[in-house]
Amino acid sequence: MERYECLGKIGEGAAGVVHVARDRTTGETVAVKRLHGGIGCGEEEWLREARCLQACRGHPHLVELRAAHREMRRGGGGACCYVVMEYVDGPSLSRVVREERRGRPFPEAEARRLMRQLLDGVAAMHAAGVMHRDLKPDNVVVGPRGDLKICDFGMSRVTAAGAPPYTSPVVTLWYRAPELILGSQEYDSLVDTWSLGCIMAELLAGAPLFPGRSEMDQLNRVFDTVGMQDMKSWPGFARLPRAESALCSRARPPSRLREMFPKLSAAGFDVLSGLLACRPDRRLTAADALRCAWFTEADTPPDATPVTCGSARFTPCVSGVADAIVV
């Protein structure tokens, strides 16, 4: 990867390590993610992440792909896989909530501004046939002007590439939809909008809504907050692998979500409760949420015009030790 001058490490996770680097050809500062090898993050995962990023190119609230590169190691030993993306100089939304605001709730108008950006990006992502499958404040970067960028597509999936069953579990536990916790492998992009509902609640409360310690604890927290009657009436509920254990665990109170957000406007609560509908078929899509009165009748104008994602065919660069090719 001689084309890129490494400037320092900015993050590391189960899938790989991310460095900030300078593109020697263009002078641009970029983020370079090197996927770990040998722990389930090989060439298939690299290609899937790059294809998802490529499908979502051109939207202001989705991190932009610059290049994807597979470099064969000298002397054999397999390949190193890299994804090169735009670099956003700013903290994660999680850090803003936790450190800069120190757990203080966002005012409703500011929460609406941020949620509009996230919903706009996710609506475009879903229109491009991509599920993110790990939406959380850690995977949202806040730019210098307060604009949000959704990043880390390492768990993403192009839905057009194949029908269910999909991998389970996916999504970080605190933001995981109930159907996923109950073992569903026939989920769809609505798992992302549940995660957005969790993020919206976190903005309004200043802390995670469902900070579960285990899958069962997480499920209990969800059903104790939003109730279980809605989920039990879903035709697909009985087919879920863990449905019986959820029913037998204990009695569930009715939803108390409204009690937890008494100052939220009726229009805002319609969005929050719609995103946090336990029944997937009653959950708001991102596009539907943007059509709710909370956004359409807001005093302040939209901060971003919806942009259609690109749909150009992705062709990865596969080479020996040559530079990455921008796609």
Curated annotation (Swiss-Prot):
The PTM Phosphothreonine maps to 167
Active-site residues from the entry: 134
GO cellular component labels: nucleus
**So where does ATP get bound?**
10-18, 33
- Give its E.C. classification number: 2.7.11.22, 2.7.11.23
Q: Which reaction does it catalyse?
A: L-seryl-[protein] + ATP = O-phospho-L-seryl-[protein] + ADP + H(+); L-threonyl-[protein] + ATP = O-phospho-L-threonyl-[protein] + ADP + H(+); [DNA-directed RNA polymerase] + ATP = phospho-[DNA-directed RNA polymerase] + ADP + H(+)
Q: Which UniProt keywords apply?
A: ATP-binding, Kinase, Nucleotide-binding, Phosphoprotein, Serine/threonine-protein kinase, Transferase
> What are this entry's molecular-function GO terms?
ATP binding; cyclin-dependent protein serine/threonine kinase activity; protein serine kinase activity; protein serine/threonine kinase activity; RNA polymerase II CTD heptapeptide repeat kinase activity
Q: Write one Pfam family the protein is assigned to.
A: Pkinase
Protein kinase domain segment(s): 4-295
Q: What class of enzyme is it?
A: transferase
Q: According to its UniProt record, which protein family does this protein belong to?
A: Belongs to the protein kinase superfamily. CMGC Ser/Thr protein kinase family. CDC2/CDKX subfamily.
Protein name (record): Putative cyclin-dependent kinase F-2
Biological source species:
Oryza sativa subsp. japonica
